[in-house]
């Protein structure tokens, strides 16, 4: 008991962690990681609410996502606060090997989505590519993206979306 099994880092790094300076640095890095994670969650949640309000204002209640990620999970959790139906998630990268994600149906091609009114990009890794692929499947105005994704193809800012 009390032994540390060295598996994912060099042994000298663990020796550093055991020093007061190393322990302090590891604690600081951990706190910074959690701070960034919570910041991401708060920003994503706020932007998600803006996107849902934008959709509801236009009568778009059947919403689909493009991409399985932490962002799609946050969007699914936020959806419970709005009068919308989540019709599915398209995993165009083929990375996800299941029929559901967080109780939402997963499909491999946009054409297999059940008549969404709008598709919101939630792909964190290849968001720009996903956006471009969706343009060939859906009208441009029916494809939305989170501003935090930084998609260059998506010119609208969140506040402009709700104003139009």
PLM segments and residue spans:
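Hydrophobic, well-ordered beta-alpha structural blocks that scaffold small-molecule cofactor pockets
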Residues: 1-5, 9-164
